Amino acid sequence: RGLGDVYKRQVKSMLDFDYIGVHPTGVVLVDQDRTGHKIHGVPVVSNLANVAEYVCREWFDEVLIVLPEDREIPQKVFDAFTEMGITIHVKIADVNEMQGKNQTVERMGNYTVITTCINMASAGQLILKRIMDICGGLVGCILTGIIFLFVAPAIYIKSPGPIFFSQYRVGKNGRKFKIYKFRSMYMDAEERKKELMKQNRVSDGLMFKMENDPRVIGSEKGPGKGIGNFIRKTSLDEFPQFFNVLKGDMSLIGTRPPTVDEWEKYELHHRARLAIKPGLTGMWQVSGRSEIMDFEEVVKLDTKYISEWSFMLDIKILFKTVLIVLGQKGSM
């Protein structure tokens, strides 16, 4: 028999993969004695019965064992490699290359598993991000208190009622939480939203954006007028969310949390943007903010942020956000 395609494919996989400092120097076939033949230039050096003796006499640093699911390496061969102090790698699964995904091998109970996720952040990185959130949340809550002294009377005079607006949003991996804002709309805003859906600039209903929203406090004075438009344009309405950041519902940087009704319309790939905690600001906000009307573009930017996340990327987005807010360009 000739050498099977399976063996050729496995050897080629080793040669093609960019192993640092590792070079295949020999192959052993478990069901054939083809000593002396070559597969893609790599010699078949022994059969299974004599492989331990061969490895003992030759120069080998490591052994990679790749077997089909219905075959097991004889325990005496495995024990022989261990006794010789050889580093052994055993294939536990065939994993297809997944673009933009990260994989690692972990222990879960008695199982050795391959973990695949959109971002493989370390515990240290997550702790650093949380420390930044706590520090930012504390400062933000203090600023929120100061802003409250000026904004609260202006809101109440124009629209008597609660100063704060709260609403359930969908956070990391589908967890629901209550988000807080300074109220920039009249009390019946949620009821009127259904009437205004035809004017939604995002056609699929996965976000709600419209020009000159009549629900905004003071909007009857004209486009961009009134206290409601002012606090939205300057993003002052978002400051109470620093309390959400401090609680741990949100992060300073992340993806914007959808409303429950928006989330219920999500397709499978949309859920990827919920793989991390939602944030006060994020990549799509600093890449166009309210000017982006294509939800698929939002999802693309959000998943790009998640897969490429680093602490320095958060710092860059944070500084860009400050510059954009100071320039009053759009709303968060």
Question: What do the PLM-derived regions correspond to, one by one?
Answer:
Residues 33-35, 95-96, 101-105, 164-218, ...:
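Short, glycine-rich, amphipathic interfacial segments at transmembrane boundaries or analogous
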Residues 205-277, 317-325:
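A short, structured surface patch at a secondary-structure boundary
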Residues 2, 63, 88, 146, ...:
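Residue-level signature of catalytic and energy-coupling elements of molecular machines
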Residues 124-192, 244, 311, 316-332:
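A hydrophobic, helix-centered structural microdomain
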Residues 85-87, 91-94, 237-245, 286-292:
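Hydrophobic alpha-helical segments characteristic of transmembrane helices
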Residues 1-145:
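N-terminal hydrophobic signal-anchor/signal peptide
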Residues 12, 46, 53, 83, ...:
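Generic recognition of well-ordered alpha-helical segments
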Residues 120, 296-311:
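Compositionally biased, charge-rich terminal segments
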